[in-house]
Curated annotation (Swiss-Prot):
F(1)F(0) ATP synthase produces ATP from ADP in the presence of a proton or sodium gradient. F-type ATPases consist of two structural domains, F(1) containing the extramembraneous catalytic core and F(0) containing the membrane proton channel, linked together by a central stalk and a peripheral stalk. During catalysis, ATP synthesis in the catalytic domain of F(1) is coupled via a rotary mechanism of the central stalk subunits to proton translocation. This protein is part of the stalk that links CF(0) to CF(1). It either transmits conformational changes from CF(0) to CF(1) or is implicated in proton conduction. HAMAP family: ATP_synth_delta_bact. It comes from the Bacteria. This is ATP synthase subunit delta. InterPro entries: ATPase_OSCP/d_CS, ATPase_OSCP/dsu. It is a peripheral membrane protein. It comes from Bifidobacterium animalis subsp. lactis (strain AD011). The keyword Transcription does not apply. F-type ATPases have 2 components, F(1) - the catalytic core - and F(0) - the membrane proton channel. F(1) has five subunits: alpha(3), beta(3), gamma(1), delta(1), epsilon(1). F(0) has three main subunits: a(1), b(2) and c(10-14). The alpha and beta chains form an alternating ring which encloses part of the gamma chain. F(1) is attached to F(0) by a central stalk formed by the gamma and epsilon chains, while a peripheral stalk is formed by the delta and b chains. One of its GO terms (cellular component) is plasma membrane. Its main location: membrane.
Amino acid sequence: MQGEASRLADRESRDSFAAKLRESGNDAWEIGNELFTITYVFDHNPRIPRALTDPGRPTEDKVALLNNLLGKQALPLTMEILTDLVGRSWSRAGDIDNAIEDFAVDAMMYQADDEKKTLKVSVQLAQLQSALLNLPVVRSDLSDSQGPLNVRYELLHALIDGADFDRITVRLAEHCTRNPRNRRYLESVQWLINKFSRHMGESMVTVTTATPLSDEQSDKLARIYTKKTGRPVHIHSVVDPTVMGGMRIQVGDEVTDNTVVAQLENLKRKVKAGVSE
C-alpha cells in the first residue's frame, strides 16, 4: 500500500501529464511500451529506484542518472514523465515503479481513445478474465514469475491468439504475465478492467449464465447496476453452459455467484462438513 506522499506524487504527476498523453496520438503506444519496459527493469533492479527516490540526492543527479540509463533511447515525453517523477517525494522507493506502471496503462488507454477502441479493449479484457475462470492451472502458470518468460508467453498466446484481440489488449495481457508484480494473473486483469472503467466513466458488469441473456434481462441488469454504482454500466454477457443455471455477476472485485453449480458446490461443502463433525 502506498503512503500519502507516494499517492500524492502519483496522482499529481499523472494529472499534470494527462493532456499531453491525450494529445500524443500514436506516440502513446510507444510511450506505454517504453514505460512497461522501464517498470520491469526497475522492479528487477531495486537499486535504481532507490537511487532515483533518495531524498538526500539532488534532483539534478537523479535526472543525470536517468539520462545515463536511457540516453536517447526513450521518446521525449517518456523522459519528461520520468524526470517529473524523480523530482517528487516518495514514501518508499518501490512506489515510483507503481507510478511508472500507472503511466504505462494511462498511455495505452489514451492510445485506445485515439483509435476509438477503449470499450472494445475493456470488453476483451473481460473476455480474457472470463476465459480463465475455469482454468486454474493456466492462471497459476501465468502468474508464476519464477517460471521461464517464454513459456508464459507461449501459454498466453495459445489462449488468446484465436480470439482476434486488439494489439492493445494483447500488450496489456502480456504485461500481466511478463511482470506479475506480486499479483495473481486474474487480479492484474481485474485491475486493468477497473482502470478502463474509471477512464470511461462507466462500470463493467460481467454476467455469466448458462444461456444468453435476453434483451429484457440485460436492460434490467443495466438499470439495477447503474443505480447501484451511481454511474453508467456496460453489461458483458458470458455464456458458460457448465454453470447449469442462475447468474454469476462480477462488478470490480465484487462477485455474486448464484449459479446452480456454485450452489451445488456449497451444498457439497456443507454435507462434507456435517459428515466430518
